[in-house]
Design a protein with these regions (language model features):
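Phosphate- and other anionic-substrate recognition elements at nucleic-acid/protein interfaces
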Residues: 1-162
Length: 162
């Protein structure tokens, strides 16, 4: 019996939904690409279209970091974060791409980030980890590193398709 699933090539997309976040993808040939989040919803939609290209929606594995407002968030920051999150949800839905979400601690723990690092140190650690995982990828920044690692987590663990 032939395993047809193994012959299907998927495109993996990971999104860090913050305004200072990013979007990354591993294409059907295994090449990683990463982009900072555009400033406008129109540019977000255009970038999403470029990323998915002509890949059928059923062959796209999309994972976005699940976010929520916390008591320590300023109202304006929480609203901005939620706005971006909702825009990505709408963009994916308009392309009939199923949106999956994961809480930050799931992918951060999986990638091996030490516990109890302060935010700035953790962000630098994650950026360095993304560079270690994808040394040929140019311009890995604080804006793209989380999306890169979310995409890696999506492919290798969440969808379990190494």
């Amino acid at each position: 019996m032939t395993n047809y699933r193994s012959k299907i090539k998927y495109k993996y997309v990971g999104i860090d939904p913050g305004k200072s976040g990013g979007i990354a993808c591993i294409d059907e040939d295994g090449k990683m690409k990463a982009y900072k989040c555009p400033d406008s919803s129109e540019d977000m939609a255009i970038l999403f279209e470029v990323i998915i290209g002509d890949t059928p929606p059923s062959n796209i594995r999309l994972l976005m970091e699940r976010v929520w407002a916390r008591p320590t968030n300023a109202v304006r920051a929480a609203f901005s974060y939620g706005t971006n999150y909702g825009q990505w949800l709408g963009i994916a839905a308009s392309h009939e791409v199923k949106m999956n979400t994961a809480i930050p601690s799931d992918w951060i723990r999986w990638i091996g980030c030490p516990k109890a690092l302060k935010s700035v140190i953790r962000k630098r650690w994650l950026k360095d980890k993304a560079k270690e995982c994808y040394p040929k990828l140019k311009k890995i920044t604080l804006k793209t590193s989380d999306a890169i690692l979310i995409t890696k987590y999506a492919k290798e663990d969440y969808f379990n398709e190494k």
